[in-house]
Amino acid sequence: SDHRRQRQMCIRDSISTVTGLGWRKAGDPVYLLGVPTADGESSTLGLAGSAYQQLAIGRLAGRPPETDFNLEARVGGLVRDAIARGLLASAHDCSDGGLSVALAESSMASDYGISADLAAGGVRMDRLLFGEGGCRVVVSVKSECVQAWAALVDAVEELPITPIGVVIDQPSLIIKVDQTPCLDLTLQQCRDAHAMALPRRIEADAEVAK
């Protein structure tokens, strides 16, 4: 059977309902949907097969995270509903690089930064920052829509929704872990590192091929 993923085209009635990955306004609260940051046990989240593992050890190994199709559907349903109601300023999945990379990418795609404080709950730092899977989506909610967002969330049963930070009016990626400083980078530093990702990968592959 053919297990290849099929790309789907989504047709919108109005461009006003299109939600990008970049932050839109300082002061907008940021939430993590899906497996919470402090969950160190979920088999749907891990480092096996991740971008971090490839960079750290130069290869992919181990059993990749499992897929919770029920949670995926519920997270996706909430995101679509919130977008349709005009509540979200941005939405970005954490499937490639993990939570910290998603926060960096949403910042680089805008003129704003993020100040985040992640609850670790004993979770290993690499899993916390770079774990992939977990049906995770990072969203920023329009500050004027916080009450409507809260009402929508209250109607959703047993869906993990974790407040993790706020959009800031400065070009910085600021991440604390349990209120302790962890990362403090300018967006230019993030962009420089991002621009070098492909050359580094090509160089690494060339070394392996020798």
Predicted regions and their residues:
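Acidic/histidine-enriched ion/cofactor-binding microenvironments in catalytic or ligand-binding pockets
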Residues: 14-35
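Glycine-rich, flexible loop/turn motifs
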Residues: 14-19, 48, 125-126, 160
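Short loop segments at secondary-structure junctions
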Residues: 12-13, 35-37, 142-144
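Glycine-/charge-enriched secondary-structure boundary and capping motifs
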Residues: 5, 61-64, 71-76, 83-210
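Gly-rich Lys/Arg/Thr-decorated short loops/hinges at beta-loop-alpha junctions or inter-strand turns
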Residues: 48-66
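Short, Lys/Arg- and Gly-enriched loop/turn segments at beta-strand edges
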Residues: 14, 37-53
